[in-house]
Amino acid sequence: MRIKNKIKKRIIELIELAYITARKGDLELAREYIKLAEMYSRKGRIKIPLKYKRMFCRKCYTPLITGVTERRRIRSKILIRTCLICNWQRRYVLSRNKGSNKEN
C-alpha cells in the first residue's frame, strides 16, 4: 500500500513538473514527463486523479495550457477543449449542480 502512495505522489509530481516546464516553453521535456507519469500509472495499476488527467492531451501528451497549447470553446452547454498541437478534441457537458437550488 505504501508503494502505491509513493507512485501516485510521483505521478502527480511529474505532471505538475510537466505543466511548469511547458509554461517555460520546453514542450518536448514536458511531454516526456507526462509519458513517464503515464507509464508509472500503467505499471503500478494506479489511476491518475481526474484533476491531473485533464491537464494534458491524451493523443500527443502535451500539457494543456489555455491560450498556449489549448483552445476552449463553449457551445450550448458543452465545453470543447482542443489541443493546438495535434487538434485533438475533448467535450465535457457543463451542467449546474443539482443540489444548489434546494431550499433548506
UniProtKB/Swiss-Prot annotation:
Superkingdom of the organism of origin: Archaea
- EC main class here is hydrolase
> Which keywords belong to this entry?
Cytoplasm, Endonuclease, Hydrolase, Metal-binding, Nuclease, tRNA processing, Zinc
Q: Which cofactor does it need?
A: Zn(2+)
Residues bound to Zn(2+) are C57, C60, C83, C86
Keyword Translocase assigned: no
- Gene Ontology CC annotation, any one: ribonuclease P complex
Q: Name one GO biological process term.
A: tRNA 5'-leader removal
GO MF terms listed in the record are: ribonuclease P activity; zinc ion binding
Subunit architecture: Consists of a catalytic RNA component and at least 4-5 protein subunits.
What is the protein named?
Answer: Ribonuclease P protein component 4
- Species source reads Saccharolobus islandicus (strain L.S.2.15 / Lassen #1) (Sulfolobus islandicus)
- Tell me the name of the encoding gene: rnp4
